[in-house]
């Protein structure tokens, strides 16, 4: 019996040596393939069709290491006909606007059985992909092809014109014979353009390991097992642009308190995280619920026509310093059990909710109640998914669900 055990041990040792030699050979051959890839591509003559991988991935060499594996995992149909959008807000809008347009492009292209294409001759499109999309969401950038298509070979079709948040059903273009179709329209801010590919969208926008680590730092360890309500506030240019309505202090606090009371009925530990672009506003609204507020000085005054409520449930409000939008998205994905959109036309607040935990529930302020100017360009049933819950305020300031 002892002889058999030793024999087996020697056999496993020899087998392990051969396995290691095999792995080394595979790694060496893989490296040579990568070198050949660089050499071949350095001598390529210009082509009309440029893949996003080849154009943008030079930024990080590690992207090339994943290229072969990514291509092998793709199972997308290779459509011959192409689709473009005019990408009205893509170069100049915030991250929420950019995501709506580029993901709507892919969703519509899938519905029309066409290849999603971005105009390679437009330098602002290339710069936006390079700076704002590929570094944050490389999997999303991989879904698009850059092409140089002469305008004489493109058929323009006007749709979704002049309104941000209305679904203009693209299925009427399904049987068009045009080889290259471009839809001239604005914003394309409706979940209906891409809701049929939501699992893929969540995969493309999943946080990187570094983003996830940075998001975890924002939440003290003692709160990580709690039921977390994530209140998103949006101020900034919304205060001055004459169209949008920023987060209102009274509604933000009242709606958050309402949700804490609601979920205390089913969860023992309920706390609040405030995400957004105005940390001083957040402190003013939740001053009596904030703990460990040490990363900046307290605001010197209250300019929000707001006073703390006399009656409020007990909870801790965790304020997050504004880092970068993708960190807030990562935080929502990892920790938010409930999201609250306090500025109803905020596209970033929308994405924060759409990409939250799979089991998360979203609440939002009634845009008509807020007197937001975007309401005139919006069909709420096209902008907010039906499972999201609208909140209203009565004459006494009490919050309730519709």
UniProtKB/Swiss-Prot annotation:
Residues 1-6 are cytoplasmic. CDD domains: Fut1_Fut2_like. It is found in: Golgi apparatus, Golgi stack membrane. Residues 28-402 are lumenal. GO terms for cellular component: Golgi cisterna membrane. The keyword Nucleus does not apply. GO terms for molecular function: glycosyltransferase activity. N-glycosylated. Keywords: Glycoprotein, Glycosyltransferase, Golgi apparatus, Membrane, Signal-anchor, Transferase, Transmembrane, Transmembrane helix. GO terms for biological process: macromolecule glycosylation; protein glycosylation. Pathway: Protein modification; protein glycosylation. The chain crosses the membrane at residues 7-27. It is a single-pass type II membrane protein. Expression is restricted to pharyngeal neurons and gland cells. Signal peptide: none annotated. Selectively catalyzes the addition of fucose in alpha 1-2 linkage to Gal-beta-(1->3)-GalNAc-alpha-R, Gal-beta-(1->3)-(GlcNAc-beta-(1->6))-GalNAc-alpha-R and Gal-beta-(1->3)-GalNAc acceptors but not Gal-beta-(1->3)-GlcNAc-beta-(1->3)-Gal-beta-(1->4)-Glc in vitro. Belongs to the glycosyltransferase 11 family. This is Galactoside 2-alpha-L-fucosyltransferase.
